[in-house]
Each structure stands twice: as C-alpha cells, then as structure tokens.
Amino acid sequence: MIRKATLSLAAIVAMLVVFATTSGPVAGQGGGGTIVGHVRYMGPTPVNPLLRMGADPRCNKLYVGKRPTAPTFVVGGDGALANVLVELEGSFPDTPVPTTPVVLDQKDCMYAPRVLGARIGQTLHVTNQDPTSHNIHSLSKSGNDFNTTQLIKGPPFEYKLKAGEILRVTCDNHSWMTAYIGIVDNPYFAVSAADGTFTIANVPPGKQTIRVWHEVMGPQTQTVDVQAGKMTTVDFSYMPGQKPAAGAVRELIVPADVEAVRIVASR
C-alpha cells in the first residue's frame, strides 16, 4: 500500500512539472516585471469647454450656481495628466478574460469614468443614477455597436465587447456626454490616475512597446526593456501646441442650450 501511494504521488508531481513548463505567463501571477509611468502636460492647463445643459432642465438643475466643463484635460500638480489610456502593443500568450464587468456610470448627466480600459470579450455594464433618461450610443468602427435608451432607475445595460478599438460612447439625449473605452486583447493596460501615474504589473520580460492615448493629444509610444521581478519606469509628456496625432478626437462645445457641436477627427 505504501509503495502504491508513493508511485501515485510521483505521478502527480510529474504532471505538475509538465504543466509549469508549458504554461505561458498569466496576468496576476509572478514571473514578470512591473512598468510604472507618469504622464504630464508640459504647459499651462488648457481651458476646458463650458457645458450648457439647458436642453434638459433636470440636468441643468444639478448644476445651479456652477459652471460645468467637459473633462477633456484633467491636469493636476506638476502637469499630471489624468484619463490617458495606456496599453502594451504586440502579441502575448492568451490569458482568461475577467468575468467581472467594467462599469460605466451615468451620474450628474456625465459619463464616469471619462476613460476606461477593458478586454475583448469582457462585459460592459452601464448604469444610470440620474433623474433623467439617457440614450447610450456607441460610435464604433469595429462592430461594437449599441444604441439603447436607459430609463430613470432602469436596469443596467450590458454588452459584451467584441473587438479591439478605442470606442467612443455618447448619449443621444445629452450631446455633451462622452466616454472612451480602450478595448484591448491582453491584460497589460491601465488609465492614468489623477496624479498622472499608471502601473502595469506582471509584464512578460523583454522589449515592450508602450502606447499612450489622450482624447485630444492623440497617441505616443516608447519601448522599454522589462526585467523579471524588477520595476521599469517611463515618462510621457505632451507639449502645448503639439499637433494632435492621428487618433485624437477634438470636441467643441458651443454655448447653445439645444445642441453641442463636435468636430471628430478620423481615428
């Protein structure tokens, strides 16, 4: 009996060794390096467009005595630039798509967050906390198409993201509402925080190309050398007067209560 148990244990150990040597890196596990970065806007903070919400008195009432602006440039101390999408370019081993949905909220007649990241195949979960109805409308070039009304205190809207792109989401009822979803095919992405920082963990070692994207200033890329178990730092800077690159989206909100005019550059 003892001999049989020993053989069984040896077989189990052998199988575990084979599995460990054939499996690729998995997000959330060790073996990779960490990329820590900072995104800055190097100049005076641009003036964000003023939003006129008179077309919906219920939205307008939320901002009595205030001057709401579009959160196009969210710049903090030392030029820290928030809401910049960060992702790694290239091909990576398959990893499980999270079963937890990414959440886009409608609150105070604005989308929140302004920019978020998600995996292809992940579920988008849109909620409405406002005292008014919304119409959630995607402007997709890759088949992530939806256009649906969401009533006051209505059930969440859910959609399984199908393809990679930077997806712009608007509201047909409130033309000033905009959000961007960076849909990617790997787990190595982030969005810069209020202090301009971002972190991507468990990155496979080797040369990696980092792409950042801002809705007005467009994309930038840098290549870094990631080492297992170590931290790699990288900084990105946008300059005043820099010509927006392909992929930037320009918005112009004019002082009119009925409609907002947008100029959208091709992505």
Each language-model region and where it sits:
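Positively charged n-region of N-terminal signal peptides that target proteins for export
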Residues: 1-4
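Extracytoplasmic copper-binding redox domains, predominantly the cupredoxin/blue-copper superfamily
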Residues: 24-267
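Bacterial N-terminal signal peptides
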Residues: 9-21
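Intrinsically disordered, low-complexity segments enriched in glycine/proline and serine/threonine
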Residues: 6-7, 262
